[in-house]
Amino acid sequence: IDVLTKVEHFKKYGVTIPNGMLLYGPPGCGKSYISEKFCEEAGFNFILIKPSDLSSIYVSGGEEKIGQLFTDAENNSPSVICFDEVDAIMPKRTEGINQSVSARVNEFLAQINKCSDRGIFVIATTNKPDLIDDAMLRSGRLELQFYIPPPDENARKELFKLHLKNRYCEIDINHEKLSNKTKNYVASDIEFIVNKAAHKSAMLDVR
């Protein structure tokens, strides 16, 4: 984060300011949440883009939307643009691919090359890094790449504490026991369990 918030200091030492990073890993592990918290800590404006936000994905016009997105981010800089499920937005350019998709990827590459000079940082998240166009992962683009694993036992315990924090509970909750019983569960699974339990309790109380 320091390299983004103290750009001039790092440039003085000849450090190349990164333009973006890729967060990849299994579904439900909090990649978008991490992106938002990263932005919050840096004090940047946060812009979340999902595949459905680019309605021109299979018709002409998608590249113009990408260009306008980066212009808007620059006008409100410092900004973080988070492309959620980036594999669906910027897939590999292969023979026979829709020309509008190829044009959109080309526009993205042109825009991200200039991000650090415009007060913009790009974060891309995906469950399928192998489907992303290779050019996006080269130096000067999404060069920072981090694997976000499923939560371990201690992380699951902390997630239960987080989601149960403001819930009404008639008994003391054994967070460690819950963690032990939810091996291989991801963050979204734990959130669902807590919400389901709260809903069931509320329904019983109504009756």
Model-identified regions with their sequence ranges:
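Walker A/P-loop NTP-binding motif of AAA+ ATPase domains
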Residues: I1-K181, Y185, A197
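AAA+ ATPase "lid" subdomain C-terminal helix
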Residues: N180-R207
